[in-house]
A protein has these predicted regions:
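Bacterial N-terminal signal peptides
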Residues: 10-18
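A structural "domain/chain start" motif
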Residues: 22-57
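C-terminal/domain-edge helix-coil "capping" segments
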Residues: 24-38, 103-160
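Interaction modules related to DNA damage response and DNA replication/repair
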Residues: 52, 56, 60-72
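Amphipathic beta-strand/beta-sheet edge segments enriched in Tyr/Trp
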Residues: 56, 71-117
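Conserved beta-propeller blade repeats
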Residues: 121, 163-180, 200, 204-224, ...
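Beta-propeller blade-edge and WD-like acidic-aromatic loop motif
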Residues: 141-156, 176, 180-201, 220, ...
């Protein structure tokens, strides 16, 4: 797909995310929330069919509101006659912002590229419309793994093990997945290169091998092993060597995830009775409970790429997606559901919506505006989505 693009000088509003993982003050976080929670009104003119549908989906899940031209701050005019073109202007400030055309792809892929360009031009953030996801699909007693565009379209089945495959996790910046499969009649961890189609067993210790989570640089992997009794958190190199045990409790640990700097792992543990979130340094020098004031039975943490926030599942009479500052503190409930995973923009979350007639539905959430959208569903019960970073 080719892009012909010209950036036009204008005074535009840029909403720039912070960079420090732990140093944002409460006042700064409140300002971020207030700023990002405002829907950005934009009008779409000249688009039809699949291109229009994709543009609406992409923009609405990234903090925009599609309105009439008379109510919009931004106007996006263009067409999708064989290619997708767009001219973006700021109606309020009377400024031209962008003129671009995409060719050589499908109408949907070209629309995704245009929406990403619009999002970045207006907000200063990279768009997410051309990102990928992985998820589990259950049919009967078996489950297989799929990868798809972030909106669920163009889904491709990855595993064909005719057993239970689960817990997909992307290697950051690569088309490689770790996951757990019962292919050999035991929960073992495999690593699958999607580009070459090759896969190999990664962890096949006695007992449970699960929850593999590659580090941000892809050089190390955290995982849950029960080879010494109860399930504990371990880390090893990406080739499986230098295995180190980080936790030693009689209760079960699960769901490790990494801080963006690769120094800390957040995980769930029942060592205090109920499930709670803990932090442990990769070198094993410290461990502490993460405060989640206002939430109990906390599991399935995922650390935002900007380092500021941890999203997780709380079970308080029903599964609830919540966030908490990475240093701990008061919890913000977001939406009913489970299996949360951050988008690369640290703004959107993909999750499993509460099951409809026993069938899992994967949805997207724009955290600041609380806008949600179901992705295109694959036949079966879908769950455990993981967003490629």
């Amino acid at each position: 797909m080719k892009c012909q693009c010209s950036w036009l000088f204008a005074c535009a509003l840029f909403l720039r995310p912070g960079t420090g993982p732990f140093n944002a003050s409460a006042q700064e976080r409140e300002l971020d929330i207030e700023r990002y929670a405002r829907l950005i009104p934009i009008s779409l003119e000249g688009y039809t069919g699949e291109a229009l549908s994709a543009l609406r989906f992409d923009l609405e899940i990234q903090g925009f509101e599609i309105t009439g031209a008379d109510k919009a701050q931004y106007l996006l005019r263009g067409s999708n006659n064989g290619d997708v073109s767009g001219q973006l202007s700021d109606r309020v400030n009377k400024a031209n912002l962008l003129s671009t055309k995409y060719t050589g792809g499908t109408s949907r892929s070209e629309a995704h590229a245009l929406s990403d360009a619009v999002v970045e031009r207006i907000t200063g953030r990279k768009g997410i419309a051309r990102t990928k996801i992985a998820f589990k699909v259950e049919n009967g007693q078996n489950s297989e793994l799929y990868v798809a565009d972030y909106d669920g379209h163009s889904a491709i089945q990855v595993t064909q093990d005719h057993t239970i495959s689960r817990d997909p996790a992307w290697v950051p910046g690569r088309r490689v997945l770790y996951y757990t499969s019962y292919k050999a009649s035991n929960p073992d961890v495999y690593v699958h290169d999607l580009q070459s189609g090759t896969r190999r067993a990664f962890a096949r210790y006695p007992g449970m091998n699960a929850g593999a989570a590659p580090s941000p640089d892809g050089r190390r992997v955290a995982l849950v092993l029960s080879k010494n009794g109860s399930p504990d958190i371990y880390v090893c190199d990406a080739d499986g060597s230098h295995l180190e045990q980080l936790t030693r409790t009689k209760e079960a640990e699960s769901s490790p995830c990494w801080s963006p700097d690769g120094r800390t792992i957040c995980y769930s543990s029942r060592e205090l009775g109920r499930s709670a979130l803990f932090l442990v340094s990769v070198d094993g020098t410290f461990k502490r409970r993460l405060r989640t004031d206002g939430a109990i039975n906390c599991t399935e943490p995922d650390w935002s790429p900007d380092g500021k926030t941890i999203v997780f599942t709380a079970n308080m009479g029903g599964f609830q997606i919540c966030t908490v500052p990475a240093g701990g503190g008061s919890v913000t409930p977001l939406v009913a559901g489970e299996d949360p995973s951050w988008a690369p923009n640290s703004r959107a979350v993909i999750f499993t919506r509460n099951r409809v007639k026993g069938r899992g539905v994967v949805s997207l959430l724009d955290v600041p505006t609380k806008q949600t959208k179901d992705i295109q569903q694959t036949s079966g019960s879908c769950s455990q989505p993981c967003w490629a970073k």
